[in-house]
């Protein structure tokens, strides 16, 4: 379908990087629109929502209501994604300001929905393939690649399988074709993502799917650097850690949300793993040269007692994660933990405050360990008038930190790409660095 080129589109992509990939697929279908950040001037306002936890749901709803208030006469307001999917039976009545609702199954049909001005909810969850055109946002050198959708885990607190369905892995060849296509356009750094990346190809009867992917990307030699997000402990193996360590392309980056360390809490959370398995994996990751380890913790899950929390706190202080996300338990419908007796909010807040102090201490230590050492980094774009924005190659975009390079020290402008840099100052959670050379 051809769309008039003078029409403007305002896209607001909420939530995770997996959501962003779906947003980029929709942009690929709406390529003839002119993108704008001004919702008031847009002919179409497209909000790709998040429905993971309560705070994300509230952000999505408020964003929709703000857009409804701002939109001009005749403009179309669309709410797509997880919130729409999760509450598709009631959301049309709850938010009548929206013109079109669609869930997680029809991102590649967004142009048709706009043309017909109709809602659409397909049963099958959409999984982006190499033939789905995407308009990559935010970088000219980095892209996300989604390797699977859905999840077969049965965590007590997580509603994702209820609206994203069972694990659905892409074919390896499709991923390789997408990587090749993006690399030819200059995207030489990629982050591979899924709800449960380490279970890639489990649904096709293959337990070493992620190892196969790493090996194939290494042989393809289309990329300079890559990393994997969202390893699940029970499907992560020492062999997988070894494959990442030995890869010339995949960075020694380990993002494995453990959620807790106490055996009794892991059982209550239905994590299908144990403290011993967690420790075996984490110790192996720490033994990898120049490894970078990120994790996620949930505080205040029903029935978390003081002893279990103290065990978690002591472990986090001892292990010293490079980065740590700490979430308060969010009671979600259609989960096992929803009806269990809750930990008081006051207790949860106090526990989070204590863990945040530990996390910040070790995060700062991780930053300072880079000072006055040459590191490999990706320079992505200009940050304001005087600085270039960069990140350590081991870091994931947006979440792990920021490095700024002062352009006054440069003889020629920097092009986005791979450079060796030396951080020299750490202040306000930002590293300042100088460039040595490209590589």
Curated annotation (Swiss-Prot):
Function summary: Catalyzes the methylthiolation of an aspartic acid residue of ribosomal protein uS12.
Pfam family, one: Radical_SAM
Record HAMAP family: MTTase_RimO
Keyword 4Fe-4S: yes
Free-text comment on the cofactor: Binds 2 [4Fe-4S] clusters. One cluster is coordinated with 3 cysteines and an exchangeable S-adenosyl-L-methionine.
EC assignment: 2.8.4.4
Listed GO CC annotations: cytosol
Molecular-function annotations in GO: 4 iron, 4 sulfur cluster binding; aspartic acid methylthiotransferase activity; metal ion binding; protein methylthiotransferase activity
Protein family according to the UniProt entry: Belongs to the methylthiotransferase family. RimO subfamily.
Name assigned to this protein: Ribosomal protein uS12 methylthiotransferase RimO
Subcellular location: Cytoplasm
Matches recorded under PANTHER family: RIBOSOMAL PROTEIN S12 METHYLTHIOTRANSFERASE RIMO (PTHR43837), RIBOSOMAL PROTEIN US12 METHYLTHIOTRANSFERASE RIMO (PTHR43837:SF1)
Domain MTTase N-terminal, residue spans: 7-119
Reactions catalysed according to its record: L-aspartate(89)-[ribosomal protein uS12]-hydrogen + (sulfur carrier)-SH + AH2 + 2 S-adenosyl-L-methionine = 3-methylsulfanyl-L-aspartate(89)-[ribosomal protein uS12]-hydrogen + (sulfur carrier)-H + 5'-deoxyadenosine + L-methionine + A + S-adenosyl-L-homocysteine + 2 H(+)
Record has Ribosomal protein as a keyword: no
Cofactor(s) demanded: [4Fe-4S] cluster
Keywords associated with the record: 4Fe-4S, Cytoplasm, Iron, Iron-sulfur, Metal-binding, S-adenosyl-L-methionine, Transferase
Native organism: Helicobacter pylori (strain P12)
Residues given in the record as [4Fe-4S] cluster 1 binding sites: 16, 50, 82
Domain Radical SAM core, first and last residues per copy: 137-368
Gene Ontology process terms (BP): tRNA modification
Chain sites annotated for binding [4Fe-4S] cluster 2: 151, 155, 158
């Amino acid at each position: 379908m051809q769309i008039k080129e003078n029409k403007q589109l305002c896209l607001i992509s909420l939530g995770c990087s997996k959501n962003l990939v779906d947003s980029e697929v929709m942009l690929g279908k709406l390529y003839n629109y002119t993108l704008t950040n001004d919702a008031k001037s847009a002919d179409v306002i497209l909000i790709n929502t998040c429905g993971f936890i309560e705070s994300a749901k509230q952000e999505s709803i408020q964003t929709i209501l703000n857009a409804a208030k701002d939109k001009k006469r005749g403009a179309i307001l669309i709410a797509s994604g997880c919130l729409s999917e999760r509450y598709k039976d009631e959301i049309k009545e709850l938010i009548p300001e929206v013109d079109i609702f669609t869930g997680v199954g029809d991102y590649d049909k967004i142009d048709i929905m706009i043309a017909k001005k109709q809602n659409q909810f397909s049963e099958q969850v959409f999984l982006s393939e190499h033939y789905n055109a995407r308009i990559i946002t935010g970088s000219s050198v980095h892209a996300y690649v989604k390797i699977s959708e859905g999840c077969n885990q049965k965590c007590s607190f997580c509603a994702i399988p209820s609206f994203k369905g069972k694990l659905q892995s892409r074919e390896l060849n499709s991923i390789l074709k997408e990587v090749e296509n993006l690399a030819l356009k200059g995207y030489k750094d990629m982050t591979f993502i899924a709800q449960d990346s380490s279970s890639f190809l489990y649904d096709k009867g293959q337990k070493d799917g992620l190892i196969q992917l790493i090996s194939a990307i290494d042989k393809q030699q289309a990329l300079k650097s890559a990393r994997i997000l969202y390893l699940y402990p029970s499907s992560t193996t020492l062999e997988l850690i070894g494959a990442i360590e030995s890869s010339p392309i995949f960075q020694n980056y380990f993002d494995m949300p453990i959620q807790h360390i106490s055996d009794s809490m892991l059982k209550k959370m239905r994590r299908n793993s144990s403290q011993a398995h967690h420790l075996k994996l984490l110790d192996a990751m720490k033994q990898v040269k120049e490894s970078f380890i990120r994790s996620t913790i949930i505080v205040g899950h029903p029935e978390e007692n003081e002893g279990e929390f103290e065990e978690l706190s002591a472990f986090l202080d001892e292990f010293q994660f490079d980065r740590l996300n700490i979430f308060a338990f969010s009671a979600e419908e259609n989960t096992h933990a929803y009806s269990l007796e809750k930990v008081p909010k006051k207790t949860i807040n106090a526990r989070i405050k204590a863990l945040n102090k530990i996390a910040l201490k070790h995060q700062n230590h991780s930053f300072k360990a880079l000072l006055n050492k040459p590191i490999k980094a990706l320079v992505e774009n200009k940050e304001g008038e005087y600085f270039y924005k960069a990140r350590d190659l081991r870091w994931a975009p947006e979440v792990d930190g920021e490095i700024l390079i002062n352009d006054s020290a440069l003889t020629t402008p920097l092009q986005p790409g791979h450079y060796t840099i030396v951080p020299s100052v750490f202040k306000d959670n930002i590293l300042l660095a100088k460039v040595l050379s490209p590589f």
